[in-house]
From Swiss-Prot:
Functional description taken from the UniProt entry: Allows the formation of correctly charged Asn-tRNA(Asn) or Gln-tRNA(Gln) through the transamidation of misacylated Asp-tRNA(Asn) or Glu-tRNA(Gln) in organisms which lack either or both of asparaginyl-tRNA or glutaminyl-tRNA synthetases. The reaction takes place in the presence of glutamine and ATP through an activated phospho-Asp-tRNA(Asn) or phospho-Glu-tRNA(Gln).
Tree of life domain: Bacteria
Keywords per UniProt: ATP-binding, Ligase, Nucleotide-binding, Protein biosynthesis
Name this protein carries in UniProt: Aspartyl/glutamyl-tRNA(Asn/Gln) amidotransferase subunit B
Keyword Translocase attached: no
GO BP: glutaminyl-tRNAGln biosynthesis via transamidation; translation
One protein family per Pfam: GatB_Yqey
Family statement drawn from the similarity comment of this UniProt entry: Belongs to the GatB/GatE family. GatB subfamily.
Entry coiled-coil feature ranges: none
Keyword Protein biosynthesis listed: yes
Catalytic activities: L-glutamyl-tRNA(Gln) + L-glutamine + ATP + H2O = L-glutaminyl-tRNA(Gln) + L-glutamate + ADP + phosphate + H(+); L-aspartyl-tRNA(Asn) + L-glutamine + ATP + H2O = L-asparaginyl-tRNA(Asn) + L-glutamate + ADP + phosphate + 2 H(+)
Oligomeric form and interacting partners: Heterotrimer of A, B and C subunits.
Listed EC numbers: 6.3.5.-
Length: 490
């Protein structure tokens, strides 16, 4: 099966729950992890006579997301009913937006591994309400003996971000989702946690002959619950479509469910079109009017976004593109870095970045910590850097101190005192050690006499061992050279 003569065309529909305090149509708490069916009311349950009242904060968050994603904002929009029947939707319809979404014509730029940049267009962002959550007694819907419904999620404000079919590979889809997640997290509209369902993604995919401008038959792929699952699902569907086409067949327009454990997709249902939902304007809500002044007020409240911050880290602090990208990848990492640089001074920015990327991230990976669980404060790191600058500890010992800070939560100065890690900078003490290691290693001494420069560094290493890494390395090299020259004159 050759993929060279085929082109994959991908569009994404990304659902993101907004982090408002309360739901979109009522005063119930918007809270993940509560006991089932505790954050509900007649509006959530669609009881007769219960009417929705718009939580305007959800509108603000939608506009904020749209501006962060370079969208135009619709000043006149409305809500519509999307009609379908499912157990988690007691009203029999979802309040959504059909022909007048709040945001439209946006884009996100992604940078691929080969350094090329691609612009992925965003067709629309509309505001809608989430449904409840089904809990199945079994591994999946088909095998479940019964299902339970938790309506805590019903009425949670949700935005749906729909891309144009601009993506061409699993790699591009993964990069887009990572970038989208970062932008939305920076803008403060959502915690975008896929593991908690606050960011969910459906994939629309088709395959066509390379060079063709016509779209192939589209498959919608659901139940892709992580970025890596999205990429695996796309790769599987791409191969499935190509296999059908090369065998002379034609893929069906259908909705399929991704089963990540088996690495396969299975048929859910034949694909519906928009007319199947019988959209019509929501009669219980007035049209939504947003003034130009309101849009500008929300724009002015946007924080510095990832692309702008990355550029600033490179221009103001001299960080490489890689280092800057790793730091801005998570909002918490960027805030941590900026606070540390503020404490240490701009001249220490590269040093802070090195410690953050090489040591802090290492420890966090080893311990399985997320960006909300940074185990060392900027104050602790800067305190340790000052001890290095003052000559109190060596760079090598600093790594030990850093690990101790992670383990104990103590500051560097306390750890150095308690562990006896102060740098040995006494010339007399170090010269005595240097003379001893030179005298007791005649073979290495002869190598040095023969012009092998690495022999001197070997002796420095022996001094570092004797002092448990506490010797000043520059002083150690100077005194090793002195001891070698003394030995050569004997």
């Amino acid at each position: 099966m050759s993929t060279a003569k085929w082109e994959t065309v991908i569009g994404l529909e990304v659902h993101v729950e907004l982090s408002t305090e309360t739901k979109i149509w009522c005063g119930c708490k918007n809270e993940f992890g509560a006991e089932p069916n505790t954050n509900v009311c007649p509006v959530c349950l669609a009881l007769p006579g219960a009417l929705p009242v718009l939580n305007y904060k959800a509108v603000e968050y939608t506009i904020r997301a749209g501006l962060a994603l370079n969208c135009k904002i619709q000043r006149h929009s409305k809500f519509d009913r999307k009609n379908y029947f499912y157990a988690d939707l007691p009203s029999g319809y979802q309040i959504s937006q059909f022909d007048l979404p709040l945001c439209y014509d946006g884009y996100v730029d992604i940078t691929k591994k080969d350094g090329t940049t691609r612009r992925i267009r965003i067709k629309r962002i509309h505001l809608e309400t989430d449904a409840g959550k089904l809990l199945h007694a079994g591994d999946d819907v088909a095998a479940a003996d019964y299902s339970l419904v938790d309506f805590n999620r019903a009425g949670v404000p949700l935005i749906e971000i729909v891309t144009e079919p601009d993506l061409r590979s699993a790699e591009e889809a993964g990069l887009f989702l990572q970038k989208l997640r970062t932008i939305l997290k920076y803008s403060g509209v959502s915690d975008v946690k896929m593991e908690e369902g606050s960011m969910r993604c459906d994939v629309n995919l088709s395959v066509r002959p390379a060079g063709s401008s016509e779209y192939g038959v589209r498959t919608e792929l659901k139940n892709v619950n992580s970025f890596s699952a999205v990429m695996r699902g796309i790769e599987y569907e791409e191969k499935r479509h190509i296999r059908i086409l090369e065998e002379g067949g034609q893929p069906e327009q259908e909705t399929r469910s991704w089963r990540d454990a088996q690495g396969i997709s299975v048929l859910l249902r034949s694909k519906e079109d928009a007319e199947d939902y019988r959209y019509f304007p929501e009669p219980d809500l007035p049209p939504l009017e947003v003034s130009a002044e309101e849009i500008e007020r929300i724009r002015a409240g946007l924080p510095e976004l990832p692309d702008a911050l990355m550029q600033r880290l490179m221009t103001e602090y001299g960080l490489s593109a890689y280092d800057a990208s790793v730091i801005v990848a998570e909002r918490e990492y960027a805030q941590w870095f900026l606070h540390a640089v503020e404490l240490a001074g701009a001249g220490q920015a590269k040093t802070v970045a090195n410690w953050q990327i090489n040591e802090l991230y290492r420890v966090m990976n080893e311990k399985g910590l997320g960006p909300e669980q940074i185990p060392v404060t900027p104050e602790q790191l800067v305190g340790m850097l000052k001890l290095i600058e003052q000559g109190t500890i060596t760079g090598k010992i600093a790594k030990t101190v850093f690990d101790k800070m992670v383990e104990t939560g103590k500051d560097a100065e306390t750890i150095v005192k308690e562990e006896g890690l102060t740098q040995v900078a006494d010339e007399g003490e170090l010269l005595a050690i240097a003379r001893e290691v030179v005298a007791s290693n005649p073979k290495v001494f002869e190598d040095w006499k023969a012009g092998k420069q690495s022999a001197a560094q070997w002796f420095v290493g022996q001094i570092m061992k004797r002092t448990r890494g506490r010797a000043n390395p520059q002083m150690a090299l100077k005194l090793v050279t002195q001891a070698l020259e003394e030995q050569a004159q004997k």
